[in-house]
Amino acid sequence: MDRRDFLKTAGLGAAALGVAACTPKVVEGGAGSTQQNGLPEGGAMQQNYPGVGLLGYGCMRWPMTAGADGRKVIDQQEVNRLVDVAMEHGVNYYDTSPNYLGGESERATAEALNRYPRDRWLLATKLSNFSDWSYDNSVLMYRNSLEIFRTDHIDYYLLHSIGGMKAFETRFGSTGIMDFLLRERELGHIRKLGFSFHGNKEGFDELMSLHSKYHWDFVQIQMNYVDWRHAGRNNTDAEYLYGVLDRMEIPVVIMEPLRGGRLADMPVTLADMLLAKDPSGSLASWAFRFAGSFPRVLTVLSGMTYMEHLEDNLRTYLDFKPLDAGEMELLQDVATRMETYPLVRCTGCNYCMPCPYGIDIPGIFKFYNDNLNAGTYVKDSGKENYARIRRRYLLDYDKAIPTVRQADHCIQCGRCEEACPQHLSIRSELRKIDEYIESLKRETL
């Protein structure tokens, strides 16, 4: 059962927010939008830092709809509706990038936010100079962001997805762009300058050694209760990353608190452990309570595509209850057990897309993980109801992933792995899934 199905089954609609209580460190949600879906007017958003809501909006997963030509486009009307409800309840930090959603995320986010006074929202966007990192192109990208948002300043500006000193020097250090960004910060056009990190411990330590030179105002890291101590190959445990930033008194922005949705849609046996402790709470609420329980956290980003996601997260942060020691221990137990499942650690960020050969890489991984979670991944032909499960698996695979976009079309070019911030062995994972599909087709399990 995914997050949307759980929320509908549990009856956790917007009206439930009416009982949200105020906590000591809160900010009142501003007026300007009308009451929608039974949500209470105003609201009280938890804060660790004055003026910044603990729940931040990640703008990489805006809802999509069919355009005039049949292709998917951002559903601007729904984006506006989501932003209205978020703003009404104190969500004021919006994180986007020139790279997100085919370059359209900034435009859609700007259209929604510019209906509000500039002092009501905090803009976080990025220097996503992955393919052309020349000085001129980097400056142009920065100025385009200012122009799109019709603003004279960016509140939080990030060097996008750095894995270590080599990437930093190539894209920023050797081009002269850092001097430009530092001048922009001095002039007030950049209020806070930081970076988002994906990489190993050595790379992180190298970047933090630059703090005395550049003074990082904040750092964005991947942090959730699994990655806290189980970040996996070529990544760094969030416990270490957060610990370094905490000691240096640098505010932390959290990305992937749900690990790409995996912590809201986990194996049934693990979900039951959390539901036994809190039958009325969503699986996602556990992850967001974990992320919000650390005092150095500036904001926790969530890519809330649907209103149910936004409402669920608002329930968590409008009446915030930090995890106690027993709950922390329970989550670490769940995390340890989760590591025994052969899930692909894909977060669905789509950085690997488009594949030059048309393969739906995130879709294939999602299908595989969803079936593992649901217990419909058969490992041997002796399992009860094997024939029925096998047939259903193959039919559902063809329905979820068009034949021309399936794993057997991978030619092992490796371009996807170069772009993957999780450092996944994508080719190996696709080959493994393709071999499994073939074994089902040939009935050779």
Q: PLM ranges: what are they?
A:
Residues 2-121, 165, 180, 186:
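N-terminal binding-site loop/beta-alpha segment at the start of enzyme catalytic domains
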Residues 57, 96, 125, 156-159, ...:
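Conserved beta-strand positions
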Residues 65-66, 132-253, 258, 265, ...:
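Glycine/proline-rich, positively charged
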Residues 93-100, 191-196, 299-301, 420:
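Short catalytic-loop micro-motif centered on adjacent basic/acidic residues
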